[in-house]
From Swiss-Prot:
Residues 21-67 form the F-box domain. GO terms for biological process: protein ubiquitination. Pathway: Protein modification; protein ubiquitination. The lineage of its organism: Eukaryota, Viridiplantae, Streptophyta, Embryophyta, Tracheophyta. CDD domains: F-box_AtSKIP3-like. The gene is PP2A13. One of its GO terms (cellular component) is nucleus. It is found in: Nucleus. SUPFAM superfamilies: F-box domain. PANTHER family: F-BOX PROTEIN PP2-A13, F-BOX PROTEIN PP2-A15. This is F-box protein PP2-A13. Keywords: Nucleus, Ubl conjugation pathway. The F-box is necessary for the interaction with ASK proteins.
Length: 290
């Protein structure tokens, strides 16, 4: 006769004068429960861990959480943690830490692991980008804002030659990734607790499109042309393109840019917050939460 697994109280059923006990999940050995947990998603594991002490102990097994981490998690973790910290952390705690945004490179970049896909997410501050003319305060300035992960955005008041670029290299977990620029027309601030947008410098973005571009070290390329016509004071994510990673053991280098270098007219009134690199499957969800 087959055994039924149940989380409730023990039950006995009469069947042809033979009593058969229904097996409860709590009756299983701790190592069996841990094996079952490897088949569950992290939120489900955490819910089970709250049921009793045995489940809580089982949920801390290293092999459970190592199966939820990317295969190359050590490379990713070394970006944000030193060797001593990594040695002390059990895999459950390491997963918890990597699932939250972690700043690195002097606070100009942030990475985390997406809980649904186990893939890498990256955010790169405007301060880590190459911006032509950024040191000339007649054109550019870094403005404080609590609407940025990095508490700062680059603002161009007016310029003829608009050119912003950057690059990054790491061993990405396998999968397809999307790259976005997070930008806003106008400059927002707060007055008497209310959010207001200064749009007086917005001009030139409707004359010629901005060219967004990315290229990878394995010769993948993407180009898109977009007029910047989103509503002033509203952050928008402009999709540059996608790239695929098939070998997580090899570093993938990415170069990206947004340019508008037609010098027949000026353009201005634009905030650049960051560049986002996200697993394609969860990009909409992550962007929607910002």
């Amino acid at each position: 006769m087959g055994a039924n697994i149940s989380g409730g109280s023990p039950e006995f059923d009469r069947n042809d004068d033979v009593y058969s006990r229904k097996l409860r999940l709590v009756d299983l050995p701790e190592n069996c429960v841990a094996l079952i947990m490897t088949r569950l998603d992290p939120p489900e594991i955490c819910r089970l861990a709250r049921l009793n002490r045995m489940f809580r102990r089982a949920s801390s097994a290293d092999f459970i959480w190592e199966s939820k981490l990317p295969a190359n998690y050590r490379v990713i973790a070394h970006k944000v943690f030193d060797e001593i910290t990594l040695t002390k952390l059990i895999k459950k705690d390491l997963y918890a830490k990597l699932s939250q945004p972690n700043l690195f490179d002097d606070g100009t970049k942030e990475l985390w692991i997406d809980k649904n896909t186990g893939r890498l997410c990256l955010s790169i501050s405007s301060k880590a980008l190459r911006i032509t003319g950024i040191d000339d305060r007649r054109y550019w300035s870094h403005i404080p804002t609590d609407e940025s992960r990095f508490q700062s955005a680059a603002y161009v008041q007016q310029i003829w030659w608009f050119e912003v670029g950057g690059e990054f290299e790491i061993q990405f977990p396998s999968g397809t990734y999307s790259l976005f620029f997070r930008i806003q027309l106008g400059k927002t601030s707060k007055r008497l607790g209310r959010r207001i947008c200064n749009s007086e410098h917005i001009h030139g973005w409707d004359i010629k499109p901005v060219r967004f571009q990315l290229a990878t070290s394995d010769n993948q390329q993407a180009v898109s042309l977009c007029y910047l016509n989103n509503n002033p004071g509203s952050w928008s994510h402009y999709h540059v393109g996608d790239f695929k990673v098939t070998n997580p053991d090899v570093s993938t280098g990415i170069k990206f840019s947004m340019t508008q270098i037609d010098c027949t007219h000026t353009k201005g009134g634009l905030c650049i917050d960051s560049v986002l690199i996200l697993p394609k499957e969860c990009a909409k969800e992550v962007i929607g939460s910002q």
